[in-house]
Amino acid sequence: MDLIRKIEAQNKKNEAFVFNVGDTVRVVYKIIEGSNERLQSFEGIVISFQNKGIGKTFLIRKISSGIGVEKIFPVYSPIIEKVEVLRRGKVRRAKLYYMRNRIGKAAIKIKERLTIKKVKH
């Protein structure tokens, strides 16, 4: 068991992505087609996390032309260039699978979490 943790620690890059379930994020990732390499972005709401050590993944959902599209991204994947948090969401669940049943504007509607900065005098 100790050997597994040692290998996971070597392959883990710094987890610079700080976001939670309910946040609206934009993931920029590499697509390699033959010898060409380009960047593509996917923007949506984080529905869930699967915590499996180095195999940690997150699921993003967006509505494209009235159809729900979901994509799973591995957190420690080398193809992910960056993850931008566009909006912080306020939710009370760890898995937002109920969003799949929503239609129209309600499918992307989540309350925004306000962040208050403390000012030192």
Curated annotation (Swiss-Prot):
<keyword id="KW-0687">Ribonucleoprotein</keyword>
<keyword id="KW-0689">Ribosomal protein</keyword>
<dbReference type="InterPro" id="IPR008991">
    <property type="entry name" value="Translation_prot_SH3-like_sf"/>
</dbReference>
<dbReference type="GO" id="GO:0006412">
    <property type="term" value="P:translation"/>
</dbReference>
<dbReference type="Pfam" id="PF01245">
    <property type="entry name" value="Ribosomal_L19"/>
</dbReference>
<protein>
    <recommendedName>
        <fullName>Large ribosomal subunit protein bL19</fullName>
    </recommendedName>
</protein>
<dbReference type="InterPro" id="IPR018257">
    <property type="entry name" value="Ribosomal_bL19_CS"/>
</dbReference>
<comment type="function">
    <text>This protein is located at the 30S-50S ribosomal subunit interface and may play a role in the structure and function of the aminoacyl-tRNA binding site.</text>
</comment>
<dbReference type="GO" id="GO:0022625">
    <property type="term" value="C:cytosolic large ribosomal subunit"/>
</dbReference>
<dbReference type="InterPro" id="IPR038657">
    <property type="entry name" value="Ribosomal_bL19_sf"/>
</dbReference>
<dbReference type="GO" id="GO:0003735">
    <property type="term" value="F:structural constituent of ribosome"/>
</dbReference>
<comment type="similarity">
    <text>Belongs to the bacterial ribosomal protein bL19 family.</text>
</comment>
<dbReference type="InterPro" id="IPR001857">
    <property type="entry name" value="Ribosomal_bL19"/>
</dbReference>
